A protein has these predicted regions:
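Extracytoplasmic ligand-binding site segments that recognize negatively charged/polar headgroups
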Residues: 50-59, 104-106, 121-134, 170-196, ...
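Proline-aspartate-enriched helix->loop->beta-strand connector
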Residues: 86-89, 93-99, 116, 226, ...
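A short, structured surface patch at a secondary-structure boundary
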Residues: 33-88
Length: 298
């Protein structure tokens, strides 16, 4: 940690003060790993994809993470009730810990005893732009933060120009969990996941926005409620199943998006790229669904 300046970051756990410029940063969550890489800052330790990633626990767009960055025990993201690797994090002697993509901050509160810890700002997915702005302040590199955000917006602006017919159309991000027979749908237009679609001219259907059942930016429904997926574009992960399994669900083939070529059945990495977006992951995932974007736009 160098310098004496102090930056205060408001989080769901209260304000976090970071004094000086941190140099040993632990990133818990794919969004923060990606944000650091945008600043050419390597995490000393990280949790990202866990068992859903490659041999280093990384997603396909995270190729620039250095070989000497330590992959931490990912039990907390791989298992319900998995332990946070507190001792492992402490052994790295971090001067800043970044946490995102967690269902509850309670198991992570003890990290603040190790180093200043930046938790999410609210109980929904933070936008990648907000995280870049936060890092810009903490690293005393606000000009770089503005440049990174402009670069990201240039990518989505280009996609919007490629498909002008998307303007005014609707989109939903969802997953069907076969083990529990539950449908999870992003319904809050202010959620970071929904804002990826918003950046290319798409909106969340108003019927979902008005739902009283939104929690953490999402609605969880039974399979009989597939009818809520009225959007022109439906991006869905068959969690624990296949596209063929989805097509067997009553009502799936009758979705408006199905007849219009707007159903994108995607893999885990692609849905994560939307669900907890970063500049890099949003570009990766949007490129994966270009055929559906073209169909919806036409």
């Amino acid at each position: 940690m160098s310098g004496s300046r102090t930056v205060t970051v408001d989080t769901i756990a209260g304000p976090t003060e970071v004094t000086g410029t941190p140099s040993r940063i632990v990133a818990f969550g794919q969004q923060w790993v990606d944000a650091l890489i945008e600043f050419d800052v390597q995490p000393v330790g990280y949790v990202s994809a866990g068992s859903n990633g490659d041999e280093r626990g990384l997603y396909p767009w995270q190729t620039e993470v250095a070989d000497d960055s330590i992959m931490l025990d990912a039990s907390a993201v791989d298992q319900v009730g998995g332990a946070v690797p507190t001792e492992q994090i402490a052994s790295l002697q971090p001067d800043l810990i970044l946490v995102s993509g967690i269902p509850s901050i309670d198991p992570y509160r003890g990290l603040s005893d190790i180093a200043p810890t930046i938790f999410p700002k609210a109980e929904k997915v933070e936008t990648w732009e907000s995280q870049i702005e936060t890092l810009g302040r903490v690293l005393d590199r606000e000009d770089d933060a503005s440049r990174i955000i402009e670069e990201g917006h240039a990518v989505t602006d280009d996609i919007e120009q490629d498909y002008p017919g998307l303007d005014g159309k609707t989109a939903v991000l969802s997953q069907f969990v076969f083990d529990t027979q539950q449908l999870a749908v992003v319904a809050d237009p202010e959620d970071g996941a929904a804002q990826v679609f918003g950046s290319i001219g798409l909106t969340v259907p108003q019927s979902l926005v008005d739902s009283p059942d939104i929690s953490h930016g999402r609605i969880v429904l039974s399979p009989e409620r597939l009818d809520v997926l009225t959007a022109d574009l439906v991006v869905m992960l068959p969690n624990g199943g296949t596209r063929e399994d989805l097509e067997k669900l009553p009502g799936f083939s009758g979705l408006p998006a199905a007849s219009g070529g707007g159903v994108a059945v995607v893999d885990f990495a692609t849905v994560v790229g939307f669900n907890t977006p970063s500049k890099a992951s949003a570009e990766y995932s949007l490129n994966k669904i270009r055929p559906q974007l073209e169909a919806v736009a036409s």
